[in-house]
């Protein structure tokens, strides 16, 4: 009679296999090791294979995005060596990272080189060559970007559309664009975001150091801005989201720039700018305006005629000091009828320029003279 033992063993093994729990995604993910990628395609294809991604000396082909979208929760991305992008006219972005609880950082000598000079023609996004935006930090939630050194972006450097994102000690160096035709090289463009903290940033460029177009609970501290258009809110109005609320710029310097502090809203649009603080801002070498708040932007340019559809309320301007050029205006405020309310100004000491006689509808608590 055949032995039943093998049958028993098979049944036992089969039962054990059925009883064993399936490995969870979290367990599987935690077991994965560091992966080092040296080409963009493999990095994009295999980005969910590791908990720690190292990008080493990658050259991204022309017209392609280094795509790290939809990373696994908790992933760390580290740039090593030089990351470069080859030239092609297109909209970009050159780099995209998204996910939750993501850390983006680099080794001490790494450079993210956008090769912007190949696109620069003095036109920026207003014409000439089609230029790609550099880094989309969109849907990069509960995350941190730390210590990146970004050089020569074709146009705007970092576009932020995220919630609860910390950006610390990032350098954006587009200073070569001063002599080579850089234009619209914004440092940080923030839209439709909440709880964004930027500390210790250094921005050398030819447009806004920071531009907040919409969003709430945004904090910028310890920044060093030079060559551009200053610390800006707006233009607000005419977008899907037209609210900017609870924004603080503090303990920062703006030098060799067109403006120091700026808020601008769109003519005949609607929206809200509320609970805004500029505190301890040091200015030097400002060519146009030390402080400028105006409600007259149309098709990207000021018209001199304000409207009141966007309200600007609860604004604190304190301890803004320094110098502007002799033909610059120290303070310029152009509000619509009744749309600017509840402002306070204190500790304003801006010297070297002119006092504007063209201010309109200046709210109680503010002044165009010192």
UniProtKB/Swiss-Prot annotation:
The active site is at residues 207, 229. It comes from Aspergillus kawachii (strain NBRC 4308) (White koji mold). One of its GO terms (molecular function) is polygalacturonase activity. Pfam families: Glyco_hydro_28. It catalyses: (1,4-alpha-D-galacturonosyl)n+m + H2O = (1,4-alpha-D-galacturonosyl)n + (1,4-alpha-D-galacturonosyl)m. Belongs to the glycosyl hydrolase 28 family. One of its GO terms (biological process) is pectin catabolic process. It comes from the Eukaryota. Involved in maceration and soft-rotting of plant tissue. Hydrolyzes the 1,4-alpha glycosidic bonds of de-esterified pectate in the smooth region of the plant cell wall. The gene is pgaA. This is Probable endopolygalacturonase A. It is an enzyme of class 3 (hydrolase).
């Amino acid at each position: 009679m055949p032995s039943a033992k093998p049958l028993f063993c098979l049944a036992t093994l089969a039962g054990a296999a059925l009883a064993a729990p399936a490995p969870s995604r979290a367990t599987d993910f935690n077991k994965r090791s560091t992966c080092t990628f040296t080409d963009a395609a493999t990095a994009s294809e295999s980005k969910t294979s590791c908990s720690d991604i190292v990008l080493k000396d990658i050259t991204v082909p022309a017209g392609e995005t280094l795509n790290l979208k939809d990373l696994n929760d908790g992933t760390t991305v580290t740039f090593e060596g030089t990351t470069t992008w080859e030239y092609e006219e297109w909209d970009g972005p050159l780099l995209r990272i998204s996910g939750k609880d993501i850390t983006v950082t680099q080794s001490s000598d790494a450079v993210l080189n956008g090769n912007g000079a190949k696109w620069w023609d003095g036109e920026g996004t207003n014409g000439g060559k089609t230029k790609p935006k550099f880094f989309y930090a969109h849907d990069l939630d509960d995350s941190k970007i730390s210590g990146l050194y970004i050089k020569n972006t074709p146009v705007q450097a970092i576009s932020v559309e995220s919630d609860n994102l910390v950006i610390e000690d990032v350098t954006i160096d587009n200073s070569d664009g001063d002599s080579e035709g850089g234009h619209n090289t914004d440092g940080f463009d923030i839209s439709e975001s909440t709880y964004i903290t930027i500390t210790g940033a250094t921005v050398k460029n030819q447009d806004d150091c920071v531009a907040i177009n919409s969003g709430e609970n945004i904090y910028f501290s310890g920044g060093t801005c030079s060559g551009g258009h200053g610390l800006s809110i707006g233009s607000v109005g005419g977008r899907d989201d037209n609210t900017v609320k609870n924004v603080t710029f503090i303990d920062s310097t703006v030098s060799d720039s067109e403006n120091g502090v700026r808020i601008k809203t769109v003519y005949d649009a609607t929206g809200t700018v509320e609970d805004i603080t500029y505190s301890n801002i040091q200015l030097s070498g400002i060519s146009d305006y030390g402080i400028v708040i105006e409600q007259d932007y149309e098709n990207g340019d000021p018209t001199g005629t304000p409207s009141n559809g966007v309200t600007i309320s609860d604004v604190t301007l304190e301890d803004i000091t320094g110098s502007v050029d002799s033909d610059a205006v120290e303070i310029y405020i152009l509000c619509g009828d009744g749309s600017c309310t509840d402002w306070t100004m204190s500790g304003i000491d801006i010297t070297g320029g002119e006092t504007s006689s063209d201010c309109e509808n200046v709210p109680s608590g503010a002044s165009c003279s010192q």
